[in-house]
Amino acid sequence: MHVKKGDKVQVMTGKDKGKQGVVLTAMPKKDRVIVEGVNMIKKHSKPSQLNPQGGIVEKEAPIHVSNVMLIDPKTGNPTRVGFTVVDGKKVRIAKKSGEALDK
C-alpha cells in the first residue's frame, strides 16, 4: 500500500474531492484508509455506560486507497509514490520531486 498512518493525503475523487487530511488508519487487507475530516458519516448510538446520552455521532468512514494521493513534502502538491532501495531498505519516494517519504 502506498500510504501509511500519519501521511498527509488529498482526496482525488468522490464527494470530498480536493480535501486534504492526515491518514488516521490504514487497512492494507481491505485496501482502505481513514482520513481525518473526510467522508464523515452520522452514526446513531444507543445510550450506554460510556455515553449515557446516546444520540448521533459524526465520524470518519473508510475510503478506498485508490481515491487518495500523497502530498509531496517539497512542493505541497499531490504526487504518485514510487519505491527505491537505499542501503538494502525499500524506501518510498515522491515521483514529482524525488524526495524520500520515509525517514
UniProtKB/Swiss-Prot annotation:
The source's domain of life comes to Bacteria
As one GO molecular function, the record gives: structural constituent of ribosome
Read off the InterPro entries from this record.
KOW, Rib_uL2_dom2, Ribosomal_uL24, Ribosomal_uL24_CS, Ribosomal_uL24_KOW, Translation_prot_SH3-like_sf
- Does NADP show up as a keyword for this record? no
The record's annotation in Gene3D superfamilies points to: 2.30.30.30
Listed under GO cellular component are: ribonucleoprotein complex; ribosome
Which CDD domains did the record assign? KOW_RPL26 (cd06089)
**What UniProt keywords are attached to this protein's entry?**
Ribonucleoprotein, Ribosomal protein, RNA-binding, rRNA-binding
Q: Quote the subunit structure annotation.
A: Part of the 50S ribosomal subunit.
Role: One of two assembly initiator proteins, it binds directly to the 5'-end of the 23S rRNA, where it nucleates assembly of the 50S subunit.
Q: Which family does it belong to?
A: Belongs to the universal ribosomal protein uL24 family.
What this protein is called in its record is Large ribosomal subunit protein uL24
Naturally occurring in which organism (per UniProt): Exiguobacterium sibiricum (strain DSM 17290 / CCUG 55495 / CIP 109462 / JCM 13490 / 255-15)
Gene assigned in the entry: rplX
